[in-house]
Amino acid sequence: MEKKIAVTAGTFDLLHPGHFNTLNFAKKHADELVVIIARDETVKKIKGRSPVIPEEQRKIMIEALKPVDRAVLGSLTNKLEPILEIRPDIIVLGPDQTTYQITELKSQLAKHFLYPEVLKVEEYVRCPFHSSFDILKEIVRRWCCKELKV
């Protein structure tokens, strides 16, 4: 029996419980989890700002997490390219991912004769720092205009 492969993708800039929730969800649905890390240049285009952590470091950090079997950098020219190379059985979208709607993603992949199951994590982890942006805002709030003590 072949191993079931799941793919999920994201920036994974400042890790928080929401990231881990999505990774665990994806791993529960497959034998192998491959994570596609958004490129710095892509993040800047989409979010209007560069990630705090460079792409290679984000890749290393994600690969170190227990649910993850492998991490790869996304394509600079075609966001479907890594998915077409990996050919996963399952694609997991995080609760806040808006790059693709499920029907649009399935339609795009079908043009390449790829028909994975596409799942969306419905549970949005609510905690004080449930997004990378919230973490950044708190750092600024605590440390802006203060002398850092090491």
Curated annotation (Swiss-Prot):
A GO BP entry? FMN metabolic process
**Example GO molecular function:** ATP binding
The catalytic activity of this protein is classed by the Enzyme Commission as 2.7.7.2
Q: Name any one Pfam family assigned in the record.
A: CTP_transf_like
Alphabetized InterPro entries for the sequence: Archaeal_FAD_synthase, Cyt_trans-like, FAD_synth_RibL, Rossmann-like_a/b/a_fold
The membrane spanning regions, by residue number, are none
UniProt KW keywords: ATP-binding, FAD, Flavoprotein, FMN, Nucleotide-binding, Nucleotidyltransferase, Transferase
Give the reaction(s) catalysed: FMN + ATP + H(+) = FAD + diphosphate
Q: Where does ATP bind?
A: T11, F12, H16, P17, G18, H19, D96, Y124
Q: What class of enzyme is it?
A: transferase
SUPFAM superfamilies for the chain:
Nucleotidylyl transferase
Q: Cofactor(s) for this protein?
A: a divalent metal cation
Q: Which domain of life is it from?
A: Archaea
Name the pathway.
Answer: Cofactor biosynthesis; FAD biosynthesis; FAD from FMN: step 1/1
Subunit arrangement?
Homodimer.
Similarity annotation: Belongs to the archaeal FAD synthase family.
Q: Name the HAMAP family for this protein.
A: FAD_synth_arch
Instruction: Relate the protein's function as given in its record.
Output: Catalyzes the transfer of the AMP portion of ATP to flavin mononucleotide (FMN) to produce flavin adenine dinucleotide (FAD) coenzyme.
Q: In its UniProt entry, what is this protein called?
A: FAD synthase
The organism encoding this protein is: Methanococcus maripaludis (strain C7 / ATCC BAA-1331)
